[in-house]
Curated annotation (Swiss-Prot):
This is Syndecan. Cell surface proteoglycan that bears heparan sulfate. Required for axonal and myotube guidance, is a necessary component of slit/robo signaling and is required in the slit target cells. Residues 36-46, 117-172 have a biased composition (Low complexity). It is found in: Membrane. The keyword Hydrolase does not apply. In 13-16 hours embryos, expressed in lymph glands, peripheral and central nervous system and basal surfaces of gut epithelia. Sdc and robo are coexpressed in domains adjacent to slit; in tracheal pits and midline glia cells. It comes from Drosophila melanogaster (Fruit fly). Disulfide bonds: none annotated. GO terms for biological process: axon guidance; cell migration; epithelial cell migration, open tracheal system; glial cell development; motor neuron axon guidance; muscle organ development; positive regulation of synaptic assembly at neuromuscular junction.
Length: 399
């Protein structure tokens, strides 16, 4: 009876295998029909991101961010050092800056407060540091003092000219570029402001004796400034910045409208580059240090590059999103290809068949072990009968 039951179970297993194969095939066909439809909107959704990203690049190339970089490339590195071209040659390059570029350059040069002085102030201030007379009695002691007084008169004249012009500009209301206002030349103001700088420098050099001599030299310098005309070949290094900031209103807190504060700033500028200045203070940048003016342009270029960098950072996530969408498209297109999909379905079907065959073989071995290895037709012998027969045949047991 048991072999008949075994034969009746095998057709049922085969039918179950066929049903499983049909179910797997239909499920694979459903996946094949669903995945291309799911891949279509993902591809359609990725296209607008790509188009938007391309549009942003085109907008940036049209003058949003590229214009600033082009202006920075045109900006000479030697501006403000005194070794570059004249103001007339540098005006087209300097006027091409944006508004925030001019504000930052004003904050960097606000120690002298000549950021928004008119361009024609250079005509009244020639460089006469080399034309100062030196006495014959003490040439070694008065030579540095004479050069410092020349620089002091230059800076004081800068401070006075800037103090008169800054009062005409309102700090909050934007104004149009005004005509240059030439301040009245006052010798008393120049000597007072330059005298303060002489006192600061004389403490390091000649104490009180050098102050009187420098004061006399100061008057002679004022006379020379009245007589001499503008020297176009030798312009002050600070006036080179004036072509940028004409007509712009300062927005930083460092630039003051009061004239007294500007005179103090001018005096502190005299002390800064010679004594050593404070840490990170504006007084470190004096008019005589040409190299420091070159370094002043570095923060401007860095700050101007910051909006462009932030724009690039804003667009980088968009680029990453495009890459993520392309990965989704890649996975969807991977299963949407007919050859790859057929291979996956075939592998799944073969795996199911192998699993079913293994289960059937295990079940067959378990049933064969339960039946036993003995023959079903042979009668079983009891151990009692065998022992009795052996005892009957054994005669030595009775002896």
């Amino acid at each position: 009876m048991k072999p008949k039951q075994k034969i009746s179970v095998e057709p049922l297993l085969l039918v179950a295998i066929l049903i499983g194969v049909l179910v797997a095939a239909t499920h694979a066909q459903d996946q094949k029909s669903v995945k291309p439809s799911a891949a279509a909107p993902s591809a359609a959704a990725s296209r607008p991101h790509d188009e938007i990203y391309i549009d942003d690049d085109s907008i940036e190339g049209s003058g949003g961010r590229g214009g600033i970089h082009e202006d920075l490339e045109k900006d000479p590195d030697y501006s403000g050092s005194g070794f570059g071209p004249d103001d007339e040659d540098a005006e087209p390059d300097q006027h091409s800056h944006s508004s925030h570029n001019t504000r930052i350059s004003q904050s960097s040069n606000s120690g002298i407060n000549t950021a928004h002085t008119p361009t024609q102030t250079s005509s009244t201030i020639p460089t006469t540091s080399t034309s100062t007379p030196m006495p014959t009695t003490t040439p070694t002691a008065t030579t540095p003092a004479s050069t410092t007084t020349a620089a002091a008169t230059q800076i004081s004249s800068f401070a006075n000219s800037s103090s008169t012009t800054t009062t005409t500009l309102a700090p909050t209301i934007p104004a149009e570029p005004q005509q240059p206002l030439f301040p009245p030349f006052d010798k008393d103001l120049d000597t007072e402001s330059s005298g303060d700088g002489i006192d600061a420098d004389a403490e390091d050099d000649d104490e009180d004796d050098g102050d009187d001599k420098d004061y006399d030299y100061n008057k002679e310098l004022d006379k020379e400034i009245d007589i001499d005309g503008p020297e176009p070949g030798h312009l002050p290094p600070v006036v080179h910045h004036n072509t940028v900031e004409t007509g712009h209103i300062p927005t930083t807190d460092e630039i003051d409208v009061d004239g007294g504060d500007e005179d103090d700033n001018g005096d502190s500028d005299i002390d800064g580059p010679r004594i050593g200045g404070n840490d990170g203070d504006i007084t470190e940048r004096g008019p005589g240090a040409g190299g420091s003016n070159v370094h002043e342009l570095d923060p401007n270029t860095n700050v101007n590059s910051q909006p462009s960098d932030t724009k690039g950072i804003d667009h980088r996530p968009n680029g990453n999103e495009v890459v993520i969408m392309s990965e989704d498209d890649r996975t969807s297109s991977f299963f949407s290809q007919p050859g790859i999909l057929a291979a996956v379905i075939g592998g799944a079907v073969v795996g199911l068949l192998c699993a079913i065959l293994v289960v059937m073989f295990i079940v067959y071995r378990m049933r064969k072990k339960d039946e036993g290895s003995y023959a079903l037709d042979e009668p079983k012998r009891s151990p009692a009968n065998n022992s009795y027969a052996k005892n009957a045949n054994n005669r030595e047991f009775y002896a």
